[in-house]
Amino acid sequence: MNRGYHEIKEHGKREFPFNIYPCSIPVDFSHVALHWHEEMEIIAVKKGKGRITVDTVSYPVEEGDILAVFPGQLHAISCGNGERMEYENIIFRLSMLMGDNGDGCTVHFLKPLQEGQAKNPVLIQRNQPDHEVFGKVIQELDRFSEIRGNG
């Protein structure tokens, strides 16, 4: 992986590596430059529309869409001229969810994700089955983040 694009910012705290960042393009910044990091990132579009590029594939997104970017994947976020997008980045280390090496979920699902074996991001659009379930998970994470506070 190209080290020039490696984001090394610590998200959350060392003992609890989780944070939610509300963002708006173009209000907060004009775009999010191409980068990668070791954390999992879930991008939930709250309002408007834009484009999320993961590796070499560009995904048009709009209000309600949820996109999961796996550790190590190059990604960028942008909007077209005159477009706006409000979204939140939910960023966390997969190690927070892992059990010991005997745990089936850790061995067969989380470790492969952490080791970069996932090749395609997951895009969940409003009209897809289970979107409502994922939306509720995002709402719970938001609620948890409000209770926990910053950092």
What residue spans do the PLM features occupy?
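N-terminal core-binding DNA-recognition domain of tyrosine site-specific recombinases/integrases
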Residues: R148-G151
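Generic protein-terminus/edge-of-domain signal
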Residues: M1-I66, Q73, V107, E115-P121
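A hydrophobic/aromatic-rich effector-binding and dimerization subdomain
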Residues: N2-N19, L74-D142
